[in-house]
Regions:
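N-terminal export/targeting leaders of redox proteins
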Residues: 1-98, 207, 214, 219-230, ...
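Extracytoplasmic electron-transfer domains, predominantly the class I c-type cytochrome c fold
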Residues: 135-205, 279-355
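Short sequence/structural segments immediately N-terminal
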Residues: 59-69, 89-94, 101, 113-117, ...
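Inter-heme linker and motif-flanking segments adjacent to c-type heme-binding CXXCH motifs
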Residues: 127-132, 187, 204-214, 247-255, ...
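Small disulfide-bonded, cysteine-rich extracellular recognition modules and tandem repeats
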Residues: 121-124, 157, 182, 226, ...
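The canonical Cys-X-X-Cys-His
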Residues: 104, 113-125, 198, 202, ...
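Electrostatic cytochrome c docking/interface patches
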Residues: 85-112, 218-264, 362-369
């Protein structure tokens, strides 16, 4: 509303100014026509000018009135501009966000609709999680086989990653996975603005968070202190408990570590267990895209359980130190807006079980370090 009002006022001022200049030009041209040929009698530069009474009287007053009129215009228009400019700016930002979201949706769409088929792998335009075909090669035998790779849901990706971290993933992809590099800088087809519009679209499909007093934008229902909606968190815990009750996992912490909800979007095993993403898991927590969590490495990095919980909650930041000898890369997502502190504690307790298993193996002579 403010933006349209200020635009209307600007148009009115412009039209008045143009009309004034047009009137001045027309009057000047018309008055000059009467002087054609008069220079034969008396040159224009020899005509007597206004006398002092006129110059210091009516003409001076007319100029002063014009000056006062312009002063009134400036006095009114400048404060009006200051009042309306924030609204105009907000309207412009909303317009850009709306257009970028629309353009991003066109890129996210299936190939048949002219997009780059992000929706094809990630579970439709709402990106609720899907499956991507991928070929892997056994490094020992050279055998090539086709697998179905779990492509995670993206409707909570802004819960866990910043815009810059998502941009990095889009630009360079995820090595050794179906996620290709899409940005020009990483060898892909998308310009920097294309990537920006994709991120704007992903913002628009985020699940609205609980505890959001002020969302980040009209098309971005997330916020700094937001949390996964209670109904979604309840569904996560129900699935974890079901896995425990069925005997698939021994504890809720183990079930959360290996959670398959939304194609593993909330799973630790996706990055820390090789083969988990295509249902051929190797050593649990043994390392893949993420570091090895077994062999006591997690305890050496985080001697205090509270420090590990804090790290998992906040994720890593590029260049920022963590733990005892860690420096962040930005690849470790923040799970603090997905899981509660109690749920994170259950996951950490499960990770610490790797250390207990190591001690038991050493005690029984299973292997030697």
């Amino acid at each position: 509303m403010f933006a349209s009002t200020s635009t209307s006022i600007a148009w009115v001022i412009l039209l008045i100014s143009l009309a004034g200049w047009a009137f001045y030009a027309f009057s000047n041209i018309r008055s000059s026509r009467g002087e054609i040929g008069s220079e034969q009698k008396l040159a224009a530069n020899r005509k007597p000018y206004y006398d002092d009474e006129i110059l210091e009287g009516p003409r001076l007053e007319r100029v002063q009135i014009l000056g006062l009129l312009f002063l009134v215009i400036i006095t009114i228009s400048l404060p009006l501009y200051w009042v309306l400019e924030p609204g105009r700016t907000a309207g412009a930002e909303f317009g850009f966000e709306k257009r970028f979201t629309k353009w991003g949706a066109e890129l996210f769409a299936p190939t048949a609709e002219g997009g780059f088929n992000c929706s094809g792998c990630h579970g439709g335009m709402k990106a609720t999680g899907g499956v991507a075909s991928y070929a892997i090669t056994d490094p020992k035998t050279g055998e090539v086989k086709s697998v179905s790779w779990k492509a995670p849901a993206l409707n909570t990706v802004l819960y866990r990653y910043t815009d810059d971290e998502i941009r990095f993933i889009l630009n360079y992809g995820r090595p050794f996975s179906p996620m290709s590099a899409w940005g020009i800088i990483g060898g892909g087809p998308l310009t920097d603005q294309n990537v920006t519009t994709l991120i704007e679209y992903m913002k628009s499909i985020q699940i609205p968070q609980d505890n959001c007093v002020e969302p980040r934008g009209p098309y971005n229902p997330t916020c700094v202190d937001g949390k996964l909606p209670a109904v979604e968190n309840k569904a996560i815990m129900a699935e974890a408990q079901r896995q425990v009750d069925s005997g698939t996992y021994a504890t809720v912490g183990e079930a959360l570590f290996n959670l398959n909800v939304n194609s593993g979007a909330y799973s630790c095993a996706r990055c820390h267990t090789k083969g988990w993403s295509y249902d051929d898991p190797q050593a649990t927590g043994g390392g893949a895209f993420g570091p090895n969590l077994t062999g006591g490495s997690s305890v050496r990095q985080f001697p205090n359980q509270s420090d590990m919980i804090s790290f998992i909650s906040g994720g890593s930041e590029l260049g920022k130190r963590y733990g005892e000898q860690g420096q962040g890369s930005g690849r470790m997502p923040a799970f603090g807006q997905v899981y509660t502190d109690e749920q994170l504690k259950l996951i950490v307790e499960y990770i610490l079980c790797f250390v207990v298993q190591l001690v038991v193996l050493k005690a029984h002579g299973g292997f030697h370090l």
